[in-house]
Each structure stands twice: as C-alpha cells, then as structure tokens.
C-alpha cells in the first residue's frame, strides 16, 4: 500500500514561502522533526528548487518551530509543483 504524500505550502519564520512534501518525524527535543522532500521556493509565482545553490539533496530536515503556518497549495501551485517534481 502506497503512503499518501502530504503536499503543503509553508511560510517559514524567515518569510520564505516553500511548497514541499512534508512529514513529521520522531526526534529528540531540539532536533529537526520535519522532513521536507523536494522543497521548492515560491518566488514571483515561479518555483525554484529550495537551497539549490547549496545542496543537491532532495530531502531537508527542519525544526517545526521554523514553520509559521502551512496551507494546502492552490490548484495552480499544486500543478506547477507536480510538473517540476515528476
């Protein structure tokens, strides 16, 4: 049975807006507890691979306290994200 992917738009504490598959993971207090898979920064209506200048990783761990809010992507953003990640 395939696990359902949870795709969300995240507003981070540094004001970046990122669309990503997100999963909460068990972690020790203070350790990163959210796994972002294939994160893309939304900038000017376009998607850019998040942290592309710094890494080739497709998975990034962050602390949930760095997420101000998360929402379901609009159909347009979801379609763009699906195209760039498939």
Listing of model-derived features with the role each one plays in the protein:
Residues 2-86:
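Conserved RNA-binding domains used in RNP assembly and mRNA/RNA metabolism
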């Amino acid at each position: 049975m395939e696990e359902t992917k949870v795709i969300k738009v995240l507003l981070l504490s540094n004001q970046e807006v990122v669309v990503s598959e997100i999963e909460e993971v068990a972690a020790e207090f203070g350790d990163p507890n959210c796994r972002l898979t294939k994160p893309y920064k939304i900038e000017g209506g376009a998607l850019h691979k998040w942290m592309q200048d710094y890494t080739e990783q497709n998975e990034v761990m962050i602390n949930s306290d760095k997420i101000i809010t998360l929402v379901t992507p609009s159909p347009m953003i979801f379609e763009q994200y699906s195209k760039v990640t498939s």
